[in-house]
A protein has these predicted regions:
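N-terminal auxiliary segments of SAM/dcSAM-dependent transferases
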Residues: 1-95
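Conserved SAM/SAH-binding loop
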Residues: 117, 142-143
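Conserved class I S-adenosyl-L-methionine
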Residues: 131-142
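Conserved SAM-binding loop of SAM-dependent methyltransferases across substrates and taxa
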Residues: 143-155
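S-adenosyl-L-methionine
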Residues: 161-201
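A short glycine-rich, Lys/Arg-flanked "PGG" loop and its adjoining helix->strand segment in the class I
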Residues: 221-235
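Conserved beta-strand signature within the Rossmann-like core of class I S-adenosyl-L-methionine
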Residues: 236-243
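Class I S-adenosyl-L-methionine
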Residues: 245-282
Length: 282
């Protein structure tokens, strides 16, 4: 198993909200989605963002955006935080001062209705009750919010696995994912189904399983995979399994997931408010 070398890049970000601030003459704005503020120089025709010239007409166009798009300011030009590689990957703005969500083919990878991605991650950490000293396994890293908050709560090493390199490369451009570079967070670029077979028995006290919807990753909802989760979890360890809300059959899907977990030995509790199943190894 080879650890992924997570290398964050500090790229200035524009979106419709801070673009409007620039056009109104505000000199200090946030270029990292609310983490900090910095000064932007300007002339009648352009803005100078960390020394990069951005023509006023481009900022005006961004300010008129109807969608919640994010734009990176590279020396070679302003580019939307979106790329194609068999699928469409996109960072989507949730608010001007908080972490964005990840979209793959238009599907949100976080709950964003009435909640921010950070609040979503924190609610999962609270639900599984991660404490100092817990050894945490985070399955499906995504933008890393769960792994980051698991590390903060456990004050210990966190192991996280992500199958899609495109997702990790997008995370490297996301200012709210920067703490993934901490040495205590070990990232592995691997298929979770195969990766988990390499892990030792009872080596974790808490597991966060946050897979894509079942139609996209059926193997991560299988009894075979759940058996592996049971094997690597210590006795009395906790598993939090996010299952989302597959259209109108959310409760039935939660019940079916809980049943499969029970069939491999877990004791379960349905947490409908966060669309998760909480399981315990007994």
């Amino acid at each position: 198993m080879q650890e992924y070398n997570f290398t964050p890049e500090s790229i200035p970000i524009l979106h419709k909200y801070n673009a409007k601030e620039l056009l109104k003459g505000k000199e200090e704005i946030s270029l990292d989605l609310g983490i900090s503020k910095e000064k932007v120089e300007s002339t009648k025709e352009a803005f100078f963002i960390r020394g990069i010239k951005v023509e006023k007409r481009i900022v005006e166009k961004i300010a008129k955006e109807k969608q919640n798009n994010i734009f990176f300011v590279f020396p070679e030009g302003v580019k939307k935080a979106l790329f194609f590689d068999k699928a469409v990957y996109k960072l989507r703005l949730v608010a001007s001062d908080t972490a964005p969500t990840l979209e793959i083919n238009g599907i949100h990878m976080h709950r964003i209705k009435g909640i921010t991605p950070l609040e979503d991650a924190k609610s999962k950490i609270k639900a599984i009750n991660i404490k100092p000293g817990d050894k945490v396994l985070d399955i499906c890293t995504g933008l890393g919010y769960s792994a980051i908050h698991a590390w903060k709560a456990s004050e210990s090493e966190v192991i996280t696995v992500e199958k899609d390199k495109n997702v990790l490369e997008l995370a490297e451009l996301n200012p709210w994912s920067r703490e993934l570079e901490r040495k205590e967070i070990k990232i592995y670029l691997a298929d979770a189904e195969e990766f988990i077979k390499e892990l030792k028995d009872e080596s974790f006290t808490a597991i966060i399983h946050d897979p894509p919807r079942e139609a996209l990753a059926r193997e991560l909802y299988s009894r075979t995979f759940y058996s592996e989760l049971y094997r690597v979890l210590a006795k009395e360890g906790r598993l939090l399994h996010y299952v989302g809300e597959p259209k109108k059959r959310a409760m039935n899907f939660l019940l079916a997931t809980a049943k499969r977990l029970e069939e491999v030995g877990f004791k379960t509790e349905i947490l409908k408010h966060i669309k998760c199943v909480l399981a315990k190894k007994v």
